[in-house]
Amino acid sequence: MPVRQLPETVVNRIAAGEVVERPASVVKELVENAIDAGAGRIDIFTDGGGRRRIGITDDGGGMTKADLALAVDRHATSKLDDEDLLRIRTLGFRGEALPSIGAVAKLGITTRHGSEPHAWSLTVEGGRKSAIVPAALTQGTRVEVSDLFYATPARLKFLKTDRTEAEAIREVVRRLAMARPDIAFTLAGEERAPVTWTAALPGAAGQLTRLGDILGADFRCSAIAVRAERDGVTVEGFAAAPSLTRANALGQYLFVNGRPVRDKLIIGAVRAAYSDYLPRDRHPVVALFVTTAPQEVDANVHPAKTEVRFRNAGLVRALIVHALKEGLAREGRRTAANSDGAVLTAFRPAAVPRPANWDWRQSPASPVGAGPWSGGATAAAFAAPGQTAFDVGAPSADVRSDPNPVADLIDRPLGAARTQIHETYIVTQTRDGLIVVDQHAAHERIVYEKLKAALERDGVQRQILLIPDIVELDEATVEKLIDRAPELEKFGLAIESFGPGAVAVRETPSLLGKTNAAALLRDLAEHMAEWDEALPLERRLMHVAATMACHGSVRAGRILKPEEMNALLREMEDTPNSGQCNHGRPTYVELKLADIEKLFGRR
């Protein structure tokens, strides 16, 4: 077959395959055009998941009649100078998206520029343009796309259900709305109820408002502001507290010079920053905005511009890690579970039907045991064999000598301990509310931070066992543990082989007190089996510290004396990142007095 020049319509359809993959691609290109045109409000409507119809109206600058005629031609744009490809400041090119859409769908454009006496309208069907005619429109541009892929029926077979395509459109609009909180967006369609995001005020407060509207109230309540800057690159945004996580990384958003992008760079950087706070199977929610000179980032890696390439990717990654770590350390005691809707709902009484003549005085009473303030059995339980004590500092000495410790401690950040419930949770009173502390989670974080500090300082102090503990394990596990013995020794855990199927434990970390060496070694072996060989030594050591902290912490079900509860609270106040345990769970929840009064109808 001889070589021949393809018709223009065929060329456009081939080009459209790179830009217009699905209805969401059309919405992305058209909304980006509206943003570039200076729109303050953008309305999007879809029908049939965008397959039957897509309509986008903006109040931007619009186009003149001459510009409209050129905008639907390939390689025609108002957004580039001759040599601007390496300094792109806009989101898209009208001459890139519109011809591609017009090649595979029925396209209608109505637009009015401020210099024109009226609007102009143009249609494109299968790549063929109509004449430009006068139309009615106050200001801006209205674009309507119908019968998507009618000119390329084979592409229709690859589309998902209307609901799935509508959800993809929604995600595209969500990302663009997060990138531009100063623009009002409305998204409507037959698939779901309309949603409107009003324009937010300039600055970080407005940005957080928009992020909260899209990512939810939980994110807004737990969001931590982060920022880092170096060598002309700025990273800023908001990160959720470690107690707000997801099962995947879909809640991590990256914007580069106002452009939403997907990049594996952020996933690795965020994982590194949160490594001290979350288990490996949980992912935090973050929204980060990178600003840099246009020539420092290549936005033309992909025709759809969903990926970028940084000239100095290492610097960007380092800034992301630094910004997140600094923010998390600064807000270490914050938790996502403070006075949010879920906590209030849990406190509201359930609607349990009772007889009209029900009298609480005639109901059977539950036996009431001695509370922790009564001593006696409490002290004996605390001294039970096998339990690990935590340090009792100076504040607890005051508690023992003061008959009314609440008055002295109520103004502390975590207040004064009032009681312990279910031998697991400490209830404290603060000046403006109450706090419930998970004693195991809280002490686990304290022990973990102490192990880290000791490792950085001069090593973890050890306690020599008079009689070594012999732990029987399978041979493969023994081999793995012995291979990692030098790393374990850094934490004061000295082990050696004791035959083909056993390990002798000769020294344990003093911080752990009396610990179950067999259970500790088995847990360590399980975690080591999951390690990637490429995992850096520092990360391996932190995994060891986390496992040891779990075993060396005060357990749920252990009764505490009041001085011990208050000592734990004071240690929490002095410990970085004490708002979450090593697994990302909150160590406490707080309920403000105002919220309590609402529950009882006093407000």
Curated annotation (Swiss-Prot):
What GO biological process, any one, is recorded here? mismatch repair
Cysteines paired by S-S bonds: none
Cite the entry's keywords alphabetically: DNA damage, DNA repair
List GO molecular-function terms, semicolon-separated.
ATP binding; ATP hydrolysis activity; ATP-dependent DNA damage sensor activity; mismatched DNA binding
- What PROSITE patterns is this protein classified in? DNA_MISMATCH_REPAIR_1
Q: Which SUPFAM superfamilies does the annotation name? A: ATPase domain of HSP90 chaperone/DNA topoisomerase II/histidine kinase, DNA mismatch repair protein MutL, Ribosomal protein S5 domain 2-like
Provide a GO CC annotation, any one: mismatch repair complex
Q: Quote the InterPro entries the UniProt record gives.
A: DNA_mismatch_repair_CS, DNA_mismatch_repair_MutL, DNA_mismatch_S5_2-like, HATPase_C_sf, MutL/Mlh/PMS, MutL/Mlh/Pms-like, MutL_C, MutL_C_dimsub
Which purpose does this protein serve, as stated in its record? This protein is involved in the repair of mismatches in DNA. It is required for dam-dependent methyl-directed DNA mismatch repair. May act as a 'molecular matchmaker', a protein that promotes the formation of a stable complex between two or more DNA-binding proteins in an ATP-dependent manner without itself being part of a final effector complex.
Protein name (record): DNA mismatch repair protein MutL
To which species is this protein native? Nitrobacter hamburgensis (strain DSM 10229 / NCIMB 13809 / X14)
Originating gene: mutL
